[in-house]
Amino acid sequence: MTEDKFVRRSLRTLSAGLEALGHEACPTTVAGWLRDLGYNLRVNVKRLTGPTHPDRDRQFRYLEEVIAEFRAAGLPILSVDTKKKELVGNFGNPGAVWVEEPYEVNAHDFLSAAQCRAAPYGLYDVLANKGHVVVGTSADTPAFAVDAVARWWVRCGCKRYRDAGELLILADSGGSNGCRPRLWKQRLQMLLADYYDLDVTVCHYPRGASKWNPVEHRLFSQVSRNWAGEPLRSPERMLSLLRGTRTQTGLTVTAEWTNQKYRRGEVVTDEQMAQLNIEHHDTCPQWNYTIKPRAPGWWHWN
C-alpha cells in the first residue's frame, strides 16, 4: 500500500475496481466513503512563493513611508505595469456576457489569424483614482514602458499636477519596468527628468509581490471584469472597452493606441550609465532611486 493521500481514478473506475474484488458499490457510495475518509475534489492551490528576499518586509515599510510623503504633499503617485498581451481579432475572451445568442469566435487562437498582438501598458494615478492605458503592438521593452509614462504625463499628469516637480513611480521589480534594465533608467532620465524637469523617484515591489502593486487590483482587475466575455475584435473595440471601465468608487479610464516599433536588446553602456543623474536611496538601494534633471541641453540626445 502506498502513502499517497490522493485518488486519481474516477468514481466509476473505483466502483468497477471494487466490484472486481467482490465488493459492490455504486459511484455515489464510493464518493461518500471518500468524504468520510477526508477526501474531497480539490484544485491546486498557488500558495508557495519560494524563498522571500531578506529585505522584503523592509521594502514594504519603506514603500508605505514614501507613498505617505508624496500623498501628504499632493504629488503624483503613478503605479505602472504591463497587462498580459491580447490577440486582437475574433477570439474568445474568458467570462460570460448577457446576450441573446453567444458570440461565434475562432475555434483556435492562432496568431496568424489576429490583426495584431496588443500589449496594454497600464498607468494608475493613485491620488486621483484614474487609469490610463497605452496599447502597443510592438515589443514590451523598457523604451515602450517609459514612452507610456511620458504619454501619461503629457496627457494627464502635467494638467492634473500643474505645480509638481516630482513624480513617484511604483513598479514591479521585473519586466520592462523592472529594477535591472538599464534602458528603463536611461529613458526615464532623458524623457522625463531632463525633458520635463522632473525629479522621478522609482520604488519597486519585491519579487513575487506584484499583486500589491495598485495598478493590478485597482485598474487591471476592473478592466478584466469589464471586457469579460467580449471578443476584442478590433483596436477600436479594445479601446472602447478600456475607456468604458468604471467603478462605483469613481475610477475612470482613458486609453490610446500606438503602432510605434520598439527594438529588443538595446544596450546601455557603462559610460552611458555613468552619465545618469541617479541617486540610490539608503534603504534597499537596488529597489529605490531618484533620477534628477541634468544640466540644460542634455535632452538634445541622439
Protein language model features and the residues they cover:
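Charge-mixed, compositionally biased segments that are often intrinsically disordered regulatory tracts
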Residues: 13, 28-104
